Amino acid sequence: MLRSDQTFVGGLSHRKRNGIFVMRIHGAKHHNPSFRAEKTYFLFDNRIICLGTGIVNDDTEHATHTNLFQKHLGEQEAPQGIVVDGQAAHQVPMKRTLDPERAHALLDTQGTGYIIPTGQLVNVARKNQKFREQHDKKELEGLFATAWIDHGKAPSAATYEYAVLVNTSPTRLAALAEAMESSDTAFYQVLQRDSVAHIVWDEDSRSLGCVFLEPVPIPPRKTEITGRVRRWWPPKATDSPLVSPLTQPIIAVERPCLAMIQQGPGHSAILSIADPDLNMIDGLSQPRELTVTLAGEWTSASPNPSTRVRVDDNAPVTHITVVCHQGRTVEMTLRKAR
């Protein structure tokens, strides 16, 4: 059984509807220990935003791929084509490399859509391929529909981004792909995607999903913090927020963690926090505190004895301290004081 030396892997649940999953990868010593990556998945209703950073290895013989889908086509599924940028593809065998200078929209045989932004080398295929049966005792062959992002051989700090739309249609997929061509109509925005954090804004649910891969200190200037509050929570609650990397309300975390904050009615917010690191000591998960800092002054509308909400006397920020244990999510409702 393969075991990883990485402990930052797990998820967050938000209002029992949305969530986040993160996986920090380090290849096993018996396979390729040079392989590393950070993968995150942000789940909003039927939309999944998938991000990857820090993809690196020293394998100069094989290309590194991020699989979008790999569907075995039985007798009933074989006649079904995949849809590539609005055009059905039924041919067998078929393999196409898509233009990296364009965004692309794919639909697999099960009605799952994929939107891949520009700057990525995407391949799609429908062909016979060999594979091992589940007990790895013999080799089989079958017809598969596949799509993948090619990062090349021995990638160094490669990245990816794509959106998955569950149970969609060609018409709906085309409309959302067109909407993504403008930041004014995009259904999601990636505010940060680097070695420090993956942060995504979902327009429909008005939610911000955050994966902090490293600790983030409080900004040194009060003016920057005040500006974040005014732009994210405008004076009128009905106004839309100005969403940008400089306005995200979660401004500091003391260690890597997950957080999702959703705009509620009025000037309220629903905040979920989780630490996927189980903090295992002698084989048991041990509780430990985690402090997350928000711009502005907040009070808790859902008091919890294991949660402390404290407004800073020296800066317009609120420190929220929760007890994390066994990877569970801590959720609370906050109200903006001013």
Please give the residue ranges for each predicted region:
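Catalytic and substrate-binding regions of extracellular carbohydrate-active enzymes
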Residues: 1-88, 92-93, 101, 110
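Long, repeat-rich segments with strong aromatic
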Residues: 18, 41, 158-168
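Broad, structure-driven detector of short, well-ordered beta-strand segments within folded domains
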Residues: 39-42, 104-106, 112-130, 209-214, ...
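Trp/Gly-enriched beta-strand surface patches
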Residues: 86-148, 298-313
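A surface-exposed beta-strand-loop module
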Residues: 140-157, 321
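Non-catalytic terminal regions with compositionally biased, polar/charged low complexity
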Residues: 167-338
